[in-house]
Amino acid sequence: MRIEALNTAPDATEVRFEEQIRPQSMSDFAGQKKLTDNLKVFITAARKRGDALDHVLLSGPPGLGKTTLAHIIAAEMGGGIKITSGPLIDKAGNLAGLLTSLKKGDILFIDEIHRLAPAVEEYLYSAMEDYRIDILLDSGPASRAVQLKLEPFTLVGATTRSGLLTSPLRARFGINSRLDYYSPELLQSIIVRAAGILNIGVDEDAAMEIARRSRGTPRIANRLLRRARDFAQVANEASISLAVARRTLESLEIDEGGLDDMDKKILEAIVRKFNGGPVGVASLAVSVGEEQDTIEEVYEPYLIQVGYLARTPRGRVATRLAMQRFSYPGMQDHGPLFDHNS
């Protein structure tokens, strides 16, 4: 499988780590069983017909395995993969260069596809539907359009904000799948597997402690595993024990529920500064000193999932659970409150 990374690369250490532990097949991919079972069927059928796989849209919070699935799809279809992201394709010409370089059966993976420029997105429509693009030669009165045929390919788009996709783009994906947060038990198995590949000793109860505080996210679980390894090595421990895991998590200020410092700042701001809400996300971002997009894409989904936050037409509102935990003594409750399961 050919891999060409066109996006801004992470640091070398992160790349080596991800390459070492990345599952190589659908069978190796932990969790998301219904999604992977369906993809196995679609891939097998496409290969039997000798066709390119239908275009695939993968949505869900960051760190759940969308990029890994794109690599697995490429491997199981027997093609190469080109990797880029929506913000990097700022001109139709850039997209044309990518599309014309694809070979039959290749995968084009576009991360953050919801951030494609409108002109670039429209250029993608004919490529997805008919495997062709129109290129404008020259400019002014002498300009003319030339149609180029493309090799059959599969576009795999990944998004953390599926609601921002336009209807015409969404309609062109034949396969639309959403990834959900992982259970602590699944994350524990992912941690144990990664530790085995990296030759890191980890006790089962330590792996579960890390899993419980990983926000249901494999990327976070693997990152915390690496940090726990650091603490174990500095303490001259042969493996990551429960005590080492807890010391690591406490040092990183990650609480029993997986909330980190920014999670707590967000909830404390809503509860204490805005009296439980509602508050607009722009005001909230200014209050905690974080980018609005980061709050919406990284922090909010998990806080909603675990019942601390609710979205309403008027803004973000702390649930009763959040009010009980983050209210200061003597604080009065005003405004609408939501039970965590409402």
UniProtKB/Swiss-Prot annotation:
GO terms for molecular function: ATP binding; ATP hydrolysis activity; four-way junction DNA binding; four-way junction helicase activity. It is found in: Cytoplasm. One of its GO terms (cellular component) is Holliday junction resolvase complex. Its EC number is 3.6.4.-. Keywords: ATP-binding, Cytoplasm, DNA damage, DNA recombination, DNA repair, DNA-binding, Hydrolase, Nucleotide-binding. Residues 183-253 are annotated as: Small ATPAse domain (RuvB-S). Mg(2+) binds at T67. InterPro entries: AAA+_ATPase, AAA_lid_4, DNA_helicase_Holl-junc_RuvB, P-loop_NTPase, RuvB-like_N, RuvB_C, WH-like_DNA-bd_sf, WH_DNA-bd_sf. GO terms for biological process: DNA recombination; DNA repair. ATP binds at I21, R22, G63, K66, T67, T68, E129, D130, Y131, R172, Y182, R219. Its main location: cytoplasm. Residues 1-182 are annotated as: Large ATPase domain (RuvB-L). CDD domains: AAA (cd00009). The keyword Lipid metabolism does not apply. Residues 256-342 are annotated as: Head domain (RuvB-H). It catalyses: ATP + H2O = ADP + phosphate + H(+). PANTHER family: HOLLIDAY JUNCTION BRANCH MIGRATION COMPLEX SUBUNIT RUVB, PTHR42848. Has 3 domains, the large (RuvB-L) and small ATPase (RuvB-S) domains and the C-terminal head (RuvB-H) domain. The head domain binds DNA, while the ATPase domains jointly bind ATP, ADP or are empty depending on the state of the subunit in the translocation cycle. During a single DNA translocation step the structure of each domain remains the same, but their relative positions change. Homohexamer. Forms an RuvA(8)-RuvB(12)-Holliday junction (HJ) complex. HJ DNA is sandwiched between 2 RuvA tetramers; dsDNA enters through RuvA and exits via RuvB. An RuvB hexamer assembles on each DNA strand where it exits the tetramer. Each RuvB hexamer is contacted by two RuvA subunits (via domain III) on 2 adjacent RuvB subunits; this complex drives branch migration. In the full resolvosome a probable DNA-RuvA(4)-RuvB(12)-RuvC(2) complex forms which resolves the HJ. NCBIfam families: PRK00080.1, ruvB. Belongs to the RuvB family. The RuvA-RuvB-RuvC complex processes Holliday junction (HJ) DNA during genetic recombination and DNA repair, while the RuvA-RuvB complex plays an important role in the rescue of blocked DNA replication forks via replication fork reversal (RFR). RuvA specifically binds to HJ cruciform DNA, conferring on it an open structure. The RuvB hexamer acts as an ATP-dependent pump, pulling dsDNA into and through the RuvAB complex. RuvB forms 2 homohexamers on either side of HJ DNA bound by 1 or 2 RuvA tetramers; 4 subunits per hexamer contact DNA at a time. This is Holliday junction branch migration complex subunit RuvB. It comes from Chlorobaculum parvum (strain DSM 263 / NCIMB 8327) (Chlorobium vibrioforme subsp. thiosulfatophilum). The lineage of its organism: Bacteria, Pseudomonadati, Chlorobiota, Chlorobiia, Chlorobiales.
